[in-house]
Amino acid sequence: NFTEITAKAVLFPDYQDVTIPANIAPLNFMITDSSATEYVVHFQSKAPSSDQLLAGGGEDGKIMIDSTQWRNLLTASKGQKIVASVYANRPSGWVKFKDYSLHVAEEPIDPYLSYRLIEPGYELYRQLGLYQRNLTNWDVHTIYENNRTYEEKNNHCINCHNYKNYSTQDMLFHVR
């Protein structure tokens, strides 16, 4: 038993009503509701197969989605939408927030993203690196790191990196 409310659940990151690629890794998130002690999220495909997935979370609001079930749901839902229903257990009982949708694109996303990771307020040449993230499973691999620890006389900066003609076959980065 639950009471339906008209408010949307507050999610971080907010994935509500967006289009996602069919091969994206599970979009785990947090629900912020100061009075709830547990959560359930029901993902229901609107594709003819009507696949579904349940995910739950405790008082911290963290919703961790099973990767195999997520992949199966997205594969079955290409070009369709998935409706997500969020339930929260409050002291007054279970409530159901307003549903939201995820539209699943038929096209896959390129699996890798490369980026330079630096500290906020970066001032010294230390702990700076180039990394590659797999967007289909969230694995991260190091391309290059200047130092794992600060060394006063042995530091160098890693500057911009780019790909020749936007192709992933050749990459260039500058170290000084």
What are these regions (language model features)?
Residues 1-176:
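Sequence signature of WD/YWTD-type beta-propeller architectures
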